[in-house]
Amino acid sequence: ARAARLAAAAPLARGKRVAARDATALLEAVLRPGERVCIEGDNQKQADLLAAALAAVDSAKVHGLHMVQSGVVLPEHLDVFERGIAKRLDYAYSGPQSQRIAKLLFGGGIELGAVHTYLELFARYFIDLTPHVALIAAVSADADGNLYTGPNTEDTPTVVEATAFKDGIVIAQVEKIVERVPRVDIPGDRVHFVVEAGRPFYVEPLFTRDPAGITETQILTAMLAIKGIYARYGVKRLNHGIGFNTAAIELLLPTYGERLGLKGQVCTHWALNPHPTLIPAIESGWVEQIHCFGSEVGMDDYIRARSDIFFTGADGSLRSNRAFCQTAGLYACDLFIGSTLQIDLAGHSSTVTAERIAGFGGAPNMGSDARGRRHPSEPWLKAGEEADARTPAALRRGRKLVVQIGETFGEKNAPMFVEQLDALRLADKLALDLAPVMVYGDDVTHVVTEEGIANLLMCRDADEREHAIRGVAGYTEIGRGRDRRLVERLRERGVIRRPEDLGIDALDADRRLLAARSIKDLVHWSEGLYAPPARFRNW
């Protein structure tokens, strides 16, 4: 099959090189109706030229494709469904296109396979979702097709491995073709065609948060997390999800964390994208090592200068790998903390709402308890003891700390706590076998809001669990429905801890506590090495 595709595309190529103007013709030559196509479509980097080329194919020649991709990020990723070029979709994340994808799903324009977590989708590339054709993005290539993927390697090795070794075709877009690549990230014998775009591939600055946007309420939740969870369990190995709440934690480490005497005791080893808001903690000596899923726009020079912290190649640039980092997050991290849009009374959380289907990204994987884990650590053992004190210690399984953090009322004053997740309504509307729940309640160990911390590990039954959640739900309808006496008993047992129970005065949650209060401050911390995207520069 591959030989026939190569022969069909041969007239368009000089060796492996295909002109950008012929990219659409190349796809028409190698694709067959109904085939599986994997396009990058990553969390951050995008094979944007190839996405546009695919959206421009003749739908009479190429139609009914089954798209398997990590991220639905660009408009072209959905244009192919509107034009009938693609029919079925299996994916993980769709943040920038969350509203449009919802409309297409509700309108029958997309046949949904499933919404996955990254590692789950990657696994299926090798079992039942193996791509016939992969469209990938790299920085540069040489004449033999050796690729340099640079800091944003991300998903590329996984996609190429699954496709190239199962009779598939790999097509790479590159910024330029060079005589010698700085580093061979993908060997040329796995790449069949190279399209020179003449410009860098698009990268979404997904993990950049302007400290100016951090509120005092978010600072309070960060203080609670640091003192009530990080310090309590001695969390050294961790992952932070996206959001202002976790950005606040990062910016409080050199100030509030220092005041608590926690340097060297917490937050030393990370599975994390290079968050700009972590720069002050790195420069203050908090961080020993970071392995990255991908890079972040503007962080390249800073990473080169801090090869003592980041994983870098001989050329000095970051080597990221989403599959490996997701594995590290699953098995080698003791804590995941992230935000969500909705939490129900069982602790299930989801980012699906009535109008948005953002997908999950890595959260279901990072926020799950790895039952195959066998190595002990202090936080893991302590959490396991809180969950199950009766089992003998030598036989007691530890627990990963999975923390959901947020304000009781979120964007547009929408309550974070709900009786029923919108994900259930979506499942009913689309006749799905499984509701798209991001983190299941039995994996969630703590819920943090401005009202305090609910420790779900210590709940003895479903009623206690429900009221622990109600107890930190504030003035939402869920919070107002609490049994005050039961909530107070839970507080007496330490299941619920208010700020004052931890010696935290809410009035101390002041923006002056942040180690950086603007993007410009982050640039200063980096000694000018961090080059923020233009949208974040106001000076």
Set out the residue ranges of the language-model regions.
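Conserved alpha/beta enzyme-core scaffold
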Residues: A1-W539
